[in-house]
Amino acid sequence: MASQFINLKSRLLNPYVVFAVWMLCTVWICITQSLAGPQNYNNFLVFRGVFDHLFSSLPLYEPYPLEYGDINHYGPIFAFIIAPFAVLPPWLGMSLWCMSLSLLLYWTVRQLPMPVVLTSLVLWLTLNDFYGACFKQQFNIAVAALVVGALAMIEKRREGWAALFIVIGTFVKIYGIVGLAFFFFVRRKGRFIGYMALWSAMALLLPLLFVSPEYLWSQYAAWAADIVQKNGENMFCAYTNISLVGCVRKISGSPAYSDLLIIVPAMVLFLLSYLRTGQYKHFSYRLTMLASLLLFIVLFSSGSEHSGYVIAALGMGIWWVNFPPPARGRLEWTLLLLALFASFSYNLLPTKFYRGVFVAYALRSLPFFAIWLHCIRRLWREDFAVTDVLLDYITLPAADEAANEAAESRPARPGDGLDIVCPCYNPAPGFVPALARSYAELCARYPDKRLHLIVVNDGSTDG
């Protein structure tokens, strides 16, 4: 039975299986939505309208009831992102848009320098919320992908791509600006700042090739006013403000206070984690920072919708896989199961309770808030040198780069690789964390060496 479970687990985490399931879900959405007709892909029609209206110099933030329901809330630069899909027949443009969102999120998660089985598990944990967001053609999928992609490109020292992802996310939906939180992890900061300035200038000036400056500046002003107005409308809206700030607002029933009373303390809690500068070098620390940012976007925004939880679910998935299995206790399992229950709540809860209580009071946010607090606690207290080793992040970035530079500057010589044999007979409690910490210290001390840790065990219980 145990071997069958292991075989099933290995098959489910196989990247080809994950990709096949991911794309089958996307294709199913494209087919069903196309056959259902335009009334089922209204969001895409709104996006398409941004392209048509900008190039006709029409207002971007006013209703067009003859074209679609709802109003656009994205920045003017979005017209250029949606352009390749807007010129196609609506059903085809919608299908390719969903396919592009799907591939973008899948690709960016796979770009994280993690073992393949871990990125596969992240995708599985995100799948249900991805399906809901893709069903509504939501740009939130791209927001999640751009934030993850920014860190992935920083890890690969591709500052230009990282800056581009942050600029696109910021100029389309503001949320992308959280990618700047990774600035302290950038090795070539001057290069990164230069690319940020370049891409920002292009995002601001590109529309001027097609519209007048007066029109463009008026639309940016209208966008700012729309964001403020939308924030007020979201306050007690049933199907928006599905966030922690919305939960507190709807339970209290009071419109008198500012959301900043909740957001500012949360920002302080998050920013305090930057004081642990010695942890910056550990990839698991940076991953925990990424998870907390993805959760923060949803938990502390009045614009959070159910489809926006693809961002929080991705954060939850990254939080989960960034745990060494021995560290997953009852608390961690409880938080994971509660978050998954919230994700499937539409199918699991009675309709009356779901709409009248669960949605009405934004209760979906609570397990994700608990996970965010868990991330903050880890950022404050954990020794991520141990986590890096236990999670097989063994080729630490600094050591890996130093070894590559050494290999380029001279031919490989005997002694570049070192085998460390560690007898392990009836180990004392705490042996594994101590061993991991020592190994991490050796990696830092000998960055030009390839260290291979060989643990010899006689089959004793704790080995």
Question: What does each of the following model-derived ranges do?
Answer:
Residues 2-161, 186-309, 313, 384, ...:
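Primarily membrane-embedded glycan-assembly and transfer machineries that use lipid-linked glycans
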Residues 33, 320-398:
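Aromatic-enriched
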Residues 166-184, 301-311:
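Transmembrane helices and adjacent periplasmic/lumenal helix-loop junctions
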Residues 390-414:
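Non-catalytic membrane-proximal stalk/linker segments that position and tether the catalytic domains
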Residues 416-419, 452:
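Cell-envelope/extracellular polymer assembly enzymes that use nucleotide-activated donors
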Residues 422-424, 457:
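Short beta-strand/turn micro-motifs composed of small residues
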Residues 427-446:
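Short, well-formed alpha-helical segments that are part of the catalytic scaffolds
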Residues 457-463:
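A conserved acidic beta->alpha catalytic loop
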